[in-house]
From Swiss-Prot:
Superkingdom assignment: Eukaryota
Compositional bias (Low complexity): 179-210
Gene Ontology CC terms: chromatin; heteromeric SMAD protein complex; homomeric SMAD protein complex; male germ cell nucleus; nuclear inner membrane
Molecular function via GO: co-SMAD binding; DEAD/H-box RNA helicase binding; DNA-binding transcription activator activity, RNA polymerase II-specific; I-SMAD binding; identical protein binding; metal ion binding; primary miRNA binding; protein kinase binding
Protein name: Mothers against decapentaplegic homolog 1
Cell compartment(s), UniProt: Cytoplasm; Nucleus
Subunit comment: Found in a complex with SMAD4 and YY1. Interacts with HGS, NANOG and ZCCHC12. Upon C-terminus phosphorylation: forms trimers with another SMAD1 and the co-SMAD SMAD4. Interacts with PEBP2-alpha subunit, CREB-binding protein (CBP), p300, SMURF1, SMURF2, USP15 and HOXC8. Associates with ZNF423 or ZNF521 in response to BMP2 leading to activate transcription of BMP target genes. Interacts with SKOR1. Interacts (via MH2 domain) with LEMD3. Binding to LEMD3 results in at least a partial reduction of receptor-mediated phosphorylation.
Repeat found in the keyword field: no
SUPFAM superfamilies to which the protein is assigned, alphabetical: SMAD MH1 domain (SSF56366), SMAD/FHA domain (SSF49879)
Family from the record: Belongs to the dwarfin/SMAD family.
Name of the gene: SMAD1
Pfam families recorded: MH1, MH2
Domain MH2 stretches: 271-465
Amino acid sequence: MNVTSLFSFTSPAVKRLLGWKQGDEEEKWAEKAVDALVKKLKKKKGAMEELEKALSCPGQPSNCVTIPRSLDGRLQVSHRKGLPHVIYCRVWRWPDLQSHHELKPLECCEFPFGSKQKEVCINPYHYKRVESPVLPPVLVPRHSEYNPQHSLLAQFRNLGQNEPHMPHNATFPDSFQQPNSHPFPHSPNSSYPNSPGSSSSTYPHSPASSDPGSPFQMPADTPPPAYLPPEDQMTHDTSQPMDTNMMAPGIHPDIHRGDVQAVAYEEPKHWCSIVYYELNNRVGEAFHASSTSILVDGFTDPSNNKNRFCLGLLSNVNRNSTIENTRRHIGKGVHLYYVGGEVYAECLSDSSIFVQSRNCNYHHGFHPTTVCKIPSGCSLKIFNNQEFAQLLAQSVNHGFETVYELTKMCTLRMSFVKGWGAEYHRQDVTSTPCWIEIHLHGPLQWLDKVLTQMGSPHNPISSVS
């Protein structure tokens, strides 16, 4: 018997509860997590029995099992801090759980974590895992009734001319608190609210994670309702804030099935690829994300961890002192995670990150090119597959060019430490010292298949279009 085992003792209650532990969750850490919980529950009459009942009879109704909420909402176990409901769901149900965004409370739960009550329920059977929504296929007309006289190319040119020389800026959470009047027309029968910006946005104070696999973030908004295609109304394109009076006549959705080709969404092997730039120079190879939880940081990791894109490893002979200084401040960088058809960005760096996402801007009613500042410790949803699916379904009725325009929505740009836009002396992202471009493979491949079915544009795309 070694010295460690002489001084270690696991109580019978902890041993019993560990009997229901799932998968390969780190043994010692799980034991400490359960031990910490037992100490809290022993102070409450019947709490231990209720937890054991829930774990032993998962199909049966059970009551809330609560512990006091800490000041920051997190629970420290050994050297790691995490959200309590996520920790115990990870121990007893889903060892591969990545973040709180993957959990939703059941209706029977009286003390869900998101309710911010003095007590928080840690009963793992009072939470369910968020599943990726099934996106409806896009119905592409076989015979387009789109009138080439109503070319949208001129409107695209006008839109580009009317856009500000520099993007607008917004700071999270300040610019996100008040509902924004939505500049994009919505389908009359859309299941989305009239003002997406009025929904509760992500909580502003999300503590930084220790690693991409740790469940240590504060909650964000829940996924929006599934898109219900309109049955008898004309849909309007919402991909850009164009003059709807000039829109080409759409194709009525209520058309014969034989006249359309259904194009379904397919989840790709790599949900995104990330390319790193310094000023206008691409540096290194693209990083292909197979894990749904990715860290992009300024450190070096020679182990080639598939969950980390370490910018500290990349060299550039043209690097100047400004770039060198900026790279030193990237630090823990950004945590990107893809869950339930949504992409979130959490700033782990001590310095802010700056994101340009047309999908996020659409949701909040901002100008398409707005750059959003995400301060340290904050988390923001930067892409929503369901909203993209709605826009794509509407856009096919307005022709090839409108659908093609959505490719801009599938590329996200993000700079570290230094921002750009109207409030900064850097006008363009290529003027920032360190930035990344994120290509979302699923939406891009879906667009590609839809465009293939639509054939060629009425006006050939050229260098001036």
